[in-house]
């Protein structure tokens, strides 16, 4: 049902591992009650504290392949050199935008490019660290990956940082509150089909 607000704004959020995407997303969900947060399907194992259907939809590789075969994903990609796959279910995103809700899609770099290609009206936002040193410290401090996986994540982060100019907006996550406020403005301050102020 359309709320009369026009089509909801779609913001595609990306950035390197450990830049604080999950923390920023939690802040946005608290500050924007009507926000539709796209829950990605993934074949990776849950991290401590992650909830199936809330943080991600954790699926088997076979179930993920079926989603691809059915054309049910807006985008999908192999992550960190093929360690796992992740993708965005298309139908819930489209339903939320038609209902006039702001939509947040958190994806990796390849996913952001694919969503932007499929939905050119979406606003792509890169969440950047204050510096490489801060990002490296955050990644290593997590302690959730093996040294080999950590090396891959650092390589991926370098690639992603180099591509931030491909995004519509770059938000530096030096302080949570300012990063969250900037993203709130982007999500609720714009609609792709709203009234034009006189």
UniProtKB/Swiss-Prot annotation:
Belongs to the guanylate kinase family. PROSITE patterns: GUANYLATE_KINASE_1, GUANYLATE_KINASE_2. This is Guanylate kinase. It comes from Mycobacterium sp. (strain MCS). The lineage of its organism: Bacteria, Bacillati, Actinomycetota, Actinomycetes, Mycobacteriales. It is an enzyme of class 2 (transferase). Essential for recycling GMP and indirectly, cGMP. The gene is gmk. InterPro entries: GK/Ca_channel_bsu, Guanylate_kin-like_dom, Guanylate_kinase, Guanylate_kinase_CS, P-loop_NTPase. It catalyses: GMP + ATP = GDP + ADP. Its EC number is 2.7.4.8. CDD domains: GMPK. HAMAP family: Guanylate_kinase. Keywords: ATP-binding, Cytoplasm, Kinase, Nucleotide-binding, Transferase. It comes from the Bacteria.
